[in-house]
């Protein structure tokens, strides 16, 4: 499922500038179609997790690493 950028901004309560910054850093990858930008549900859930970690004081790189970590590693089964 894909969401227009406006919907992603509203759901995650972030600014257009923040979304552009995340895109420039490779956190999310919008798809342009018919003059609009769309993001996948994976992008939305991934960015939501990153924002939660950042709200707890983690820098972007660490938040990103934790969100992208495989489930087994998180549960201590490495």
What are these regions (language model features)?
Residues 1-11, 20, 24-36, 41-78:
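Arg/Lys-rich, alpha-helical DNA-contact motif
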